[in-house]
Every structure is written in C-alpha cells, then in structure tokens.
Amino acid sequence: MSNYSGLNILKSNAKELAKKKGIKLTEALEAIAIDAAFSNYHELSSVAKRFPLEPRLMKAAFGETHFENVIFSSDVYVQFEMAVDELLSDAVASTNANGFAVYDLEPTEVQYDEEKGLLNMTVAFSYEGEQMPDHFFSGISFFLTANVPLIYRDNNWLIAEEGIEIISSDSNADPDSDWYDL
C-alpha cells in the first residue's frame, strides 16, 4: 500500500492522535474508525483494501466523499480562483469588462496517484466579467479547460507547485480580433 492511500493517511492521523492524547495506537485507530462511521478499525481496514474509494473512507482520509468534490472545497476553490485571475490577467486587461469570476466549474477527468499523493484534475469552466458601460464590446467571457494538479499534505488539499495549466480556451470576443489568444 502506498504512502498516500486513504488507509495510510488514516494510520498517520491515528499516530498523531495517539501521541497528542497519550493513548495507545490501537485506541486511536478504533477512534478514527468509529468517527468515520465504521463499526471498528478492522471493518475500516477491510473496506479500504477492497473499496479504496468508499465514501466514508474518502471523507475520513481526504475530507471529501469523492475526488471530484475537492476542487469545490473552500480553500482549493479560493486558490483556484486566484491562480486563474493571475493566469488570465493579460487577456482580461484587453477586454472592456471587469469583475471577472469563475462560473460553471466542472471536473471532467480525475486521477489520483497514491504513490505521490497527487490528484490530477481536468476541469472545464467559464471566466466571465461584466461589460463596462460606455465601452465597445470586446468580449466578456472565456471558455476554458485546464489541468489542475492538487496535492494532499497535512490533511489539506493544495494546488501543486507546477500550478494550473490552461489546455484550451475560447472567447466570445470579436472573431476577427486576436487579442484573446492565450
């Protein structure tokens, strides 16, 4: 079993709990299992080996019942929005719009690497602003697909160091203009 499997993450959490509360590791494992809605640690361990993506196990180990939900957790979503703001700042500066935000965020592909604790997610979304009054229309929306690498460290999901990569983009700008090419 790998370092970043759900079961190994829960074992690490149990070690920390045992140390923090001054209890035996077996007691900490039982407490974590019961807190995760399993009857005992043996049940949790058996389920983890047969069904590593079982929702109770996922929630206890990764904070979400499905990997697709990770992008919507508050910390990750804020990180994602900030990264998109930065990536698209030049393109946004060329529009006659402001107040851009992410809309219709949808994970389209999700893969978790238990060896590295790396969740590779492909997402589709729009990035939309509001037309500034008294300015010519030059586009207010970008339609994007991006790769979002996330790592799970210290019971938190973070955007990995390599950051978000935009893999496709389109805009509702004038098709004769080339300002929106990313």
Give the positions of each predicted feature.
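C-terminal alpha-helical interaction appendages
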Residues: 1-72
